[in-house]
């Protein structure tokens, strides 16, 4: 199946009572994946791994094209990812020359998986169909099932003929910037590439599976001191926070800058807090409970605002914002640090953007992504232009930024934010926890890894970094 003509094989749908042929294929696929897992667990060489058969199908979490209307008329908060995320066998795609087959040991839940599962703001099959029209290799993605997931750690099994820097047996993590490195628009900043996509959201064959196909320029070395699940939970949120806070493409934080961080105990917020602290800044973290405030202080953030205790109501009603509440937030920030923040780390979107623009310092900036509470944004432009503030958009990270962020994880300078772990069979429960904001940090998912705690190759360095630091969120989430 490698480097051949692409085939657009129909996926194996989850149906009761599989046909004898489908049942045989499933048994063969399970045996092949079991052999792969055994080989990885026994420390097989790269040559031995390369000699193993790639199964015709593999277990994956996916949504179905014929179910995209299942939530019609249902409020977003009432949509249950457990009903739309299926775990079953799907057909293995052919391998493009610039890709690798990856045995996925662990993955993680991100908001884009929640969006995919509730088909908001629109079903992702439109993304897959558009990719399918671009090339023969793109056509593989246009299926009636969408395998989701934008984080992964695992082991390279096979490499395409154009892959130079990776080989079977390499232990890797995966960042989600899916871009054609032969596209000239990708070479100033690949996030500006005309064909830039997020893997597992705007492409098929994502990381919530036992197997994946991944572009070689998505691969990064797995941190040797972390487990599979700890390694898998970082790339999307850590790289996003790095670009928003550190990179010259977005935040470009300086030593001494104050940064207001919404959702500071969450996925990207927890990484942002660490980057501000490491860079000599002053984080002001906004959280939603005393427990999360305590967790944030455990990261080293001294200045914390519990928004529920404060009772901010930035919207007087569905259509009207309340400037008095913006001012109250500004006073609370100044009471903590004595001034307005130079940077506001903004990702909730509609619910907070008006307040973010208001509280940013004169000449400061609001760095924004995601808009998880709503993407139709309102703010008072007078507070922007009259005080020379700026709004800077940021979307994930380019390869260099993702690599730098991953290096800081590998050096023990940034810690994983894993708070809970589910098996792949419970991916719906994991996505529901994120949808309902029930989990701090990141929610991990075990794929091929049979249990937590596996994959540590440098126990000595792990001890140097400190078990308490690495597992802070995990212990809090237990």
Regions found by a protein language model. Name each.
Residues 36-53, 68-106, 144-147, 162-163:
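A short N-terminal beta-strand-loop micro-motif at the entrance of redox/enzyme domains
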Residues 91-108, 121-184, 223:
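Glycine-rich beta-strand-centered segment in the early N-terminal region that forms part
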Residues 360-361:
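Helix-to-beta-strand junctions that scaffold the AdoMet/dcAdoMet cofactor pocket
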Residues 372-386:
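Rossmann-fold NAD(P)-binding glycine/threonine-rich loop
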């Amino acid at each position: 199946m490698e480097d051949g003509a692409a085939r657009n094989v129909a996926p194996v749908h989850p149906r009761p009572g599989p046909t004898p042929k489908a049942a045989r294929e499933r048994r063969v696929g399970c045996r092949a994946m079991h052999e792969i897992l055994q080989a990885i667990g026994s420390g097989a060489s790269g040559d031995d791994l390369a000699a193993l058969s790639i199964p015709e199908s593999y277990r994956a979490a996916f949504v179905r094209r014929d179910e995209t209307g299942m939530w019609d008329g249902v409020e977003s908060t009432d949509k249950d990812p457990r009903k739309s995320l299926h775990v079953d066998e799907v057909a293995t795609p052919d391998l493009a020359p610039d890709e690798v087959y990856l045995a996925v040991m662990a993955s993680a839940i991100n908001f884009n998986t929640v969006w995919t599962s509730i088909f908001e703001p629109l079903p992702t099959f439109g993304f897959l169909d558009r990719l399918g029209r671009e090339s023969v290799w793109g056509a593989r993605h246009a299926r009636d099932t969408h395998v989701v997931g934008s984080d992964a750690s695992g082991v390279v099994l096979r490499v395409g003929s154009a892959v130079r820097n990776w080989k079977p047996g390499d232990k890797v993590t995966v960042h989600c910037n899916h871009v054609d490195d032969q596209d000239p628009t990708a070479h100033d900043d690949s996030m500006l590439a005309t064909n830039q996509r997020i893997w597992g959201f705007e492409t098929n064959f994502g990381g919530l599976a036992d197997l994946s196909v991944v572009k070689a320029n998505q691969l990064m070395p797995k941190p040797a001191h972390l487990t599979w699940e700890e390694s898998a939970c970082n790339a999307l949120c850590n790289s996003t926070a790095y670009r928003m806070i550190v990179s010259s493409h977005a935040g470009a934080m300086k030593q001494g800058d104050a940064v207001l961080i919404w959702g500071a105990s969450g996925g990207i917020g927890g990484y942002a807090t660490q980057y501000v602290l490491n860079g000599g800044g002053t984080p002001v973290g906004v959280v939603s409970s005393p427990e999360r405030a305590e967790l944030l202080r455990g990261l080293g953030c001294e200045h914390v605002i519990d928004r529920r205790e404060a009772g901010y109501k930035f919207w007087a009603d569905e259509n009207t914002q309340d400037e008095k509440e913006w001012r109250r937030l500004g006073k609370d920030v100044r009471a903590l640090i004595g001034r307005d923040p130079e940077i506001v780390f903004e990702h909730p979107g509609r619910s907070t953007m008006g307040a973010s623009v208001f509280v940013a310092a004169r000449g400061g900036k609001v760095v924004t992504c995601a808009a998880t509470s709503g993407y139709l944004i309102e703010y008072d432009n007078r507070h922007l232009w009259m005080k020379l503030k700026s709004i800077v958009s940021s979307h994930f990270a380019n390869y260099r930024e993702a690599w730098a962020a991953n290096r800081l994880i590998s050096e023990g300078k940034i810690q994983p934010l894993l708070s809970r772990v589910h098996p792949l069979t419970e991916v719906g429960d994991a996505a529901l926890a994120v949808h309902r904001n029930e989990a701090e940090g990141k929610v991990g998912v075990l794929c091929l890894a049979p249990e937590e705690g596996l994959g540590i190759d440098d126990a000595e360095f792990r001890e140097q970094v400190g078990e308490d630091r690495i597992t802070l969120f995990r212990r809090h989430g237990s």
